[in-house]
Each structure stands twice: as structure tokens, then as C-alpha cells.
A protein has these predicted regions:
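Conserved Nudix-box catalytic region and its N-terminal flanking loop in Nudix hydrolases
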Residues: 49-90
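Conserved N-terminal beta-strand and adjoining loop/helix that marks the start
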Residues: 30-51, 73
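NUDIX/MutT-family hydrolases
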Residues: 120, 128-160
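Methionine residue identity
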Residues: 1-3
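Short secondary-structure junctions
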Residues: 91-98
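Low-acidity, Ser/Thr- and Arg-rich intrinsically disordered low-complexity segments
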Residues: 5, 10, 14-16
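Short, Lys/Arg-enriched N-terminal segments with co-localized hydrophobic residues
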Residues: 14-30
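Active-site-adjacent beta-strand/loop module that shapes the phosphate/pyrophosphate-binding cleft
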Residues: 46, 95, 104-127, 135-137, ...
Length: 161
């Protein structure tokens, strides 16, 4: 059975179709073309509560003032362990004890990608300072979902003990 071809669109239909925004299909190479960072996070637990830090303003609106576990980018030649000690000292003037690895997640943001690796940590004896964050909270596991997390850190919640 022969099928008739669809009628050609009228000029009016063509004009209206030109204004429709078509979503670009997912292309796995898009992530490969972005800058990629290895990032580590300290999941600090004290008396059953998790330390959550609120980010400062950023050039990237999608992470500005969102919540995260403290940490930072792994520099060339650094181990994850050394990076955590350095970043927490720089951002909080605090010494921590780095424990076991909880796992890693990959997060693609509009401008870059990260592999985020979390470690279970214990805080040092003295109090920390807010040198690079707006605020902090100690929260029980069941309270964590209520925060406005960065997308990468939100994925880490599934790895928490």
C-alpha cells in the first residue's frame, strides 16, 4: 500500500516553526570537551551530625550560596589526603583527620565537570573559622535533604553512612 507524502508546510507554519527552540540531543562528547577537575570532599561527622558549609558568591550562579561538604580541587602532584588537609586548613583554619573513602560521583555542570570523591573525616580539637564560606550547620542525616546543595554534593548524600 502506498502512503501519500505529508503536505508541504504553509509559509505561516514554516515561520512559526522557525521560532521553536529545539533542545539539543545529549552528546556524550560534550562532557569530554569541558574542563574537568578532580575534587575531594571532607564528610566531617561529630556526634552523629554532619558538617555542611554554605558557599560564598561565585561566578557560577548554579553553585552560588549552595551547600557543600568542605574540600576543594586536587592540584597536580597532590594526593586526595593532602588536598583535604590543605583545603580545610586554607578555608577553615582547621586540622582534620582523614578516614576512609566513601566513594566518588561525576557531576557535569554547564561550564565544567568534576569527579567528586568523599572521605569520612573527623574534626580537630579547636574550633574552625569561616574564612571561605558564608555559613555552616551541623545536621543529622535526616535533615540533610532540606538544604540547597550543589548538584555534585547532593549526589554524595547517597554515599553517607
Amino acid at each position: 500500500m502506498l502512503m501519500a507524502s505529508p503536505p508541504l508546510a504553509s509559509e505561516k507554519e514554516r515561520e512559526s516553526n522557525e521560532t521553536i527552540k529545539i533542545r539539543k540531543p545529549y552528546n556524550p562528547t560534550d562532557m569530554e570537551n569541558k574542563k574537568h577537575y578532580n575534587v575531594v570532599a571532607a564528610v566531617v561527622v561529630d556526634d552523629g551530625k554532619y558538617l555542611c558549609m554554605q558557599r560564598c558568591r561565585s561566578q557560577y550562579a548554579y553553585i552560588t550560596e549552595h551547600w557543600e561538604f568542605p574540600g576543594g580541587k586536587v592540584e597536580e602532584g597532590e594526593t586526595d589526603h593532602h588536598t583535604l588537609l590543605r583545603e580545610i586548613k586554607e578555608e577553615m583554619d582547621w586540622d582534620i583527620y582523614v578516614g576512609r573513602k566513601l566513594g566518588s560521583v561525576i557531576q557535569e555542570y554547564p561550564d565544567f565537570c568534576i569527579t567528586l570523591t568523599a572521605y569520612l573525616c573527623k574534626g580537630g580539637d579547636k574550633a574552625f573559622k569561616l574564612l571561605d564560606h558564608l555559613d555552616y550547620k551541623w545536621l543529622a542525616r535526616e535533615e540533610l535533604d532540606a538544604l540547597n546543595w550543589t548538584e555534585g554534593d547532593r549526589k554524595l548524600l547517597a554515599l553517607l553512612p
